[in-house]
Curated annotation (Swiss-Prot):
Alphabetized GO MF terms: NAD binding; oxidoreductase activity, acting on NAD(P)H, quinone or similar compound as acceptor; quinone binding
Enzyme nomenclature, EC number: 7.1.1.-
Cellular component annotations (GO), alphabetically ordered: plasma membrane-derived thylakoid membrane
Protein location: Cellular thylakoid membrane
Alphabetized Gene3D superfamilies for the sequence: Cytochrome-c3 Hydrogenase, chain B
Subunit (UniProt): NDH-1 can be composed of about 15 different subunits; different subcomplexes with different compositions have been identified which probably have different functions.
Record function comment: NDH-1 shuttles electrons from an unknown electron donor, via FMN and iron-sulfur (Fe-S) centers, to quinones in the respiratory and/or the photosynthetic chain. The immediate electron acceptor for the enzyme in this species is believed to be plastoquinone. Couples the redox reaction to proton translocation, and thus conserves the redox energy in a proton gradient. Cyanobacterial NDH-1 also plays a role in inorganic carbon-concentration.
Organism, as annotated: Prochlorococcus marinus (strain MIT 9215)
Name of the molecule in the record: NAD(P)H-quinone oxidoreductase subunit H
Pfam families hit by this protein: Complex1_49kDa (PF00346)
InterPro entries the record matches: NADH_Q_OxRdtase_suD, NADH_UbQ_OxRdtase_49kDa_CS, NDH1_su_D/H, NiFe-Hase_large
Gene: ndhH
Record's bilayer topology term: Peripheral membrane protein
Keyword annotations of the record: Membrane, NAD, NADP, Plastoquinone, Quinone, Thylakoid, Translocase, Transport
Top-rank EC class of the record's enzyme: translocase
Length: 395
C-alpha cells in the first residue's frame, strides 16, 4: 500500500505593528514551516520623527527636552549624552557635585528601565504577577524624579551643559537611601518568585542563544553583549562622569540565552543600588541642606566649600552658546547598551551634523538570525529579551 506523503508550504504571518505583545510599533514578517520559523524580516520606521534633523535645526540648549521622548524608559540617558557631546567638544568642565547628581539620576533610570523590561517580559512568557509588582517600585523612582526635576516619567529636562538644572532639594538624599533600603529586599523577592521557578526556566532556557563571537560581530551592547560572556561596560571602559569613584562589578553571564539576559539585568539592578548608596554618601558637600549650612557658617569666600566642585553647574550656558568647530563621538552605557552621539560643529548655535546611535537598533538587527529554527510561540519571548523601545529605534 502506497504511503501518503505530507507536504507543507511556507506560510507568511505578520506580527504587528499592532500586537498585544509587540514592544512598540514593530512589524515582523515571519515565514513559517508548520510551527518552525524559517525566516523573519523586521519592518521598522513607523515611529520615525526625524530627531536628528530636529537637532540640526535647534540650539543645543533647546534640544534637551526633545530627547527623552525617543526612549521613554531611558530619558535621562539621552539627556546626558546630548549635553556630553558639546561639553567635550567645547572643553566645558563639570563640577564633581554635578557629576555625582548625574550618576544618581542615571542609575535610578537604569533600575527603572530594567523594571519596565522585567514586567512585560514576564507577562509575555505567561507570568502575570510580577507585572504588577514592578510598578510599585517604579512609582518610588518617579517620586524621587518629581522631587528633583519636577517631572515624573519623561521630559525631565534636568541635564545642562556643564552640570544640572538645579541642586537636589532638601531631604532628597535621605529619601533616596530609604528607597535603596526598600528596593534591595524586593529584588530578593523577585528572585525567589522568578529565578529558580521551574516553569519559567523551562520556558526560556536555551532560547535565542547568541555566542560570544556573534555578539561581538553584530555590534551588540549592554545586557545582550554581557549575557554572552563579554564583560564590557562603558562605565568601566570609558570611566565617564565619576564612576571610577565607586566600587561595583560588571554583571555578566556566559550562556547567551534569554535566561542569561534576565540574570544580567537583575544583577545590574543590584549593582546600580550599590552605586546609588555610595554616591549618596560620597557626594561633595553632602545633602543640600548641610552644604548650605556650611556655606553660611564660613566667612572666607575663598574656602573650598565655595569652589567649583561643590556647585551643581560650572557656568550657566547662554542660549546663544555656539558649538565650536570640530567633530567627535561620545558614548555612554544606558540600560539597553551603548548610546552615542556624533556631533560636528561649525561655530554656530546649531550643530552641522548630529548623529544618534541607539543601542536597541543595533541589538534588534540580530533578531532574524536568532529566530531561525525557533518555534512561533517563542518569538515574543526572544524579542522581549532584547528590550527594544521603538521610539529610539526609529528616532
Amino acid at each position: 500500500m502506497a504511503q501518503l506523503e505530507t507536504r507543507t508550504e511556507p506560510m507568511v504571518v505578520n506580527f504587528g505593528p499592532h500586537h498585544p505583545s509587540m514592544h512598540g510599533v514593530l512589524r515582523l514578517v515571519v515565514t513559517l514551516d508548520g510551527e518552525n520559523v524559517i525566516d523573519c524580516e523586521p519592518v521598522i520606521g513607523y515611529l520615525h520623527r526625524g530627531m536628528e534633523k530636529i537637532a540640526e535645526n535647534r540650539t543645543n540648549v533647546m534640544y534637551v527636552p526633545y530627547v527623552s521622548r525617543m526612549d521613554y524608559a531611558a530619558g535621562m540617558f539621552y539627556e546626558a549624552i546630548v549635553v556630553n557631546a558639546p561639553e567635550r567638544l567645547a572643553n566645558i568642565p563639570v563640577p564633581k557635585r554635578a557629576s555625582y547628581i548625574r550618576v544618581l539620576m542615571l542609575e535610578l533610570n537604569r533600575i527603572a528601565n530594567h523594571l519596565l523590561w522585567l514586567g512585560p517580559f514576564l507577562a509575555d512568557v505567561g507570568a502575570q504577577t510580577p507585572f504588577f509588582y514592578i510598578f510599585r517600585e517604579r512609582e518610588m523612582i518617579y517620586d524621587l524624579w518629581e522631587a528633583a526635576t519636577g517631572q515624573r516619567l519623561i521630559n525631565n529636562n534636568f541635564f545642562r551643559i556643564g552640570g544640572v538644572a538645579c541642586d537636589l532639594p532638601y531631604g532628597w538624599l535621605e529619601k533616596c537611601i530609604d528607597f535603596c533600603d526598600w528596593f534591595g529586599p524586593k529584588i530578593d523577592e523577585y528572585e525567589k518568585l522568578i529565578t529558580n521557578n521551574p516553569i519559567f526556566r523551562k520556558r526560556i532556557e536555551g532560547l535565542g542563544t547568541i555566542q560570544r563571537d556573534q555578539a561581538i560581530n553584530w555590534s551588540l551592547s549592554g545586557p545582550m553583549l554581557r549575557a554572552s560572556g563579554v564583560s564590557w561596560d562603558l562605565r568601566k571602559v570609558d570611566s565617564y562622569e565619576c564612576y571610577d569613584d565607586f566600587d561595583w562589578q560588571i554583571a555578566s553571564e556566559k550562556e547567551g540565552d534569554c535566561y542569561a539576559r534576565y540574570r544580567v539585568r537583575v544583577e545590574e539592578m543590584r549593582q546600580s543600588l550599590s552605586i546609588i548608596r555610595q554616591a549618596c554618601k560620597m557626594i561633595p558637600g553632602g545633602p543640600t541642606e548641610n552644604l548650605e549650612a556650611q556655606r553660611m557658617a564660613t566667612e572666607d569666600k575663598k574656602s573650598e566649600i565655595f569652589g567649583i566642585d561643590y556647585q551643581y553647574v560650572a557656568k550657566k550656558v547662554a542660549p546663544t552658546f555656539k558649538i565650536p568647530n570640530g567633530e567627535l563621538y561620545t558614548r555612554l552605557e544606558s540600560g539597553k547598551g551603548e548610546i552615542g552621539v556624533f556631533i560636528q560643529g561649525n561655530n554656530e548655535v546649531t550643530p552641522w551634523r548630529f548623529k544618534i546611535r541607539a543601542a536597541d537598533l543595533n541589538n534588534l538587527q540580530i533578531l532574524p538570525h536568532i529566530l531561525k529554527g525557533a518555534k512561533i510561540a517563542d518569538i515574543m519571548a526572544i524579542l522581549g529579551s532584547i528590550d527594544v523601545i521603538m521610539g529610539s529605534v526609529d528616532r
